[in-house]
Amino acid sequence: MDIKRTVLWVIFSFSLLMLWDNYNRYTGKPSIFFDSTTTQQAAAPAATGNNAAKTADAPTAATTAATSGANTPGVPDGAAAVKSEVITITTDLMKIGIDTAGGEVRHLELLKHHESGDESKNVVLFDENGQHTYLGQTGLIGGAYPNHKSMFAAVPGPRTLDSANQVQLVLQSEQQGVKLIKTFTFKRGEYKVDIKHDVVNNTSTAITPSLYLQLVHDGSALGGGSMFMASAFTGPAIYTEADKFQKVTFESIEKGKAEHAMKGESGWIALVQHYFVSAFVPPANTPREYFTKKLATNLYAVGTILPMGTVAPGATASMDTTMYSGPQESKRLEAVAPGFELVKDYGWLTIIAKPIFWLMMQIHQILGNWGWTIIVLTIVIKLAFFPLSAAGYRSMAKMKLVTPKMTDIRTRYKGEPQKMNAAMMELYKKEKINPIGGCFPMLVQIPVFISLYWVLLASVEIRNASWLWIHDLAAPDILFGSYHIGTFHLTIGILPILMAISMFIQTKLNPTPPDPIQAKVMMFMPIAFSVMFFFFPAGLVLYWVVNNILSIAQQWFINEKLLGGKAKA
């Protein structure tokens, strides 16, 4: 039994270690176990500046379906330099800058989401500042048509939402008789932007243009998470009905080995980062091609190409698309497009994590505070597992009663393992003890623990949520300060300390292993785990502390009441 309990602790410890390593690799940090080439390359100023994004070739339908990750020929480079204007549109949720040079989205600021630890700064998604490049580009291919390198003229109109429910920005560009009109519609309370593309054929011959939508990003991770999640994963994603949700790393694009769907009748493209996402969603039931490619050093694109059919002389063809750029709030994601909620990554235990998040949302609607929500959720989970855990604690209490007899057997048959094991089994049979019965509560909680970890890791709803002294439940508890030791960042809070104390009490309530080495290992566990929990989100540690307190109360009740206090021995 003692060996099995120790093995279980090792399994639990290894699970936490693998969870930590998985988080490191998820956020682009070096793995503890594996050597890997990081996808965060050193930024090259020439590549991430205006020239690289502006002179990058537009995609072509003929080549993107055959190759992914390679530069594709398109409109000629070296377009004449034209003075442009960045037009700023302000709504109740965001401030967005659209450049008349190319009609591209160059800046997008979320007015309701602040940088973690600095409420004076809003989260910025689209931007180009010399260190990061993040752009949204659209245009036409198939001929010398307007694209993201063409000059557009803005139609006069309001630039702020004010008291209206929507505001529009209309941009026009004509090249060799083909006019492209982009109409951006911004609505109150929405992170979705409707973008209508009208192609007017003012030539004397029919044309067959295709519309491309692409998101451009450098290979470095952006912020937007808490200090614990400072280098959260950033990368392209493609969704189709046939192939579902597919993540693509910048590293695979760099090596020309990106694997993803190439064609489809529906779906979308996105750039995913921690807590936030930007995406282009074309109309459903429209044939399209998908591509990823390297534009320049440390600069990549993910996009889609949609044929607009034949446009006769004097005729107009239109295509409505949607751009979403905002937080990964579940309700908003579900309303954007089929499968779009998958950008919120709950890891490999999604089947457990989603119900946990749903339950959290229901509780939060009643309580209105995420800290108290986590506490109530913990109580609910504990009640759900009460019958099973109670049986386990009874088994552990009985084990504590027979610990002296087990010690006597070990002493009597020292050096005779076969006789010792036989005597142990006879003791278990006589006392009606299940030697692994005490393991069940922990085994059951491990998947729930991991699932809740991913819920707290992925849920922007909890970001910057406060509870008592904690200002951000998605970041480590820093009540006693944050310290930098070289490149090492340590935060010290009361929750990990309470975690260690609760684990120590639990250890004292459990049967003491007869083996002195095992006993020392068990006593060392609270210290080891408390150090690890200094780096975990406060919300997760809060859950585990409350869970431990409830477990202690339950185990004490069983020891003192159900066994008549005999388990004290």
Swiss-Prot record:
Subcellular location(s) per record: Cell inner membrane
Which GO MF term does the entry hold, naming one? membrane insertase activity
- Which UniProt keywords are given for this protein, alphabetically ordered? Cell inner membrane, Cell membrane, Chaperone, Membrane, Protein transport, Transmembrane, Transmembrane helix, Transport
Which InterPro entries does the UniProt record give? Answer: Membr_insert_YidC, Membr_insert_YidC_N, YidC/ALB3/OXA1/COX18, YidC/Oxa/ALB_C, YidC_ALB_C, YidC_periplasmic_sf
- Membrane spanning residue stretches: 7-24, 219-239, 299-319, 340-360, 366-386, 436-456, 485-505, 526-546
Instruction: Determine if Lyase is one of this entry's keywords.
Output: no
| Membrane topology value | Multi-pass membrane protein
Q: Which GO terms describe its cellular component?
A: plasma membrane
Q: Which Gene3D superfamilies match?
A: 2.70.98.90
Q: Write down the superkingdom of origin.
A: Bacteria
Q: What HAMAP family does the record point to? A: YidC_type1 (MF_01810)
Q: Which PANTHER family match?
A: CYTOCHROME C OXIDASE ASSEMBLY PROTEIN COX18, MITOCHONDRIAL, OXA1
This chain's protein is named Membrane protein insertase YidC
The organism of origin for this protein: Herminiimonas arsenicoxydans
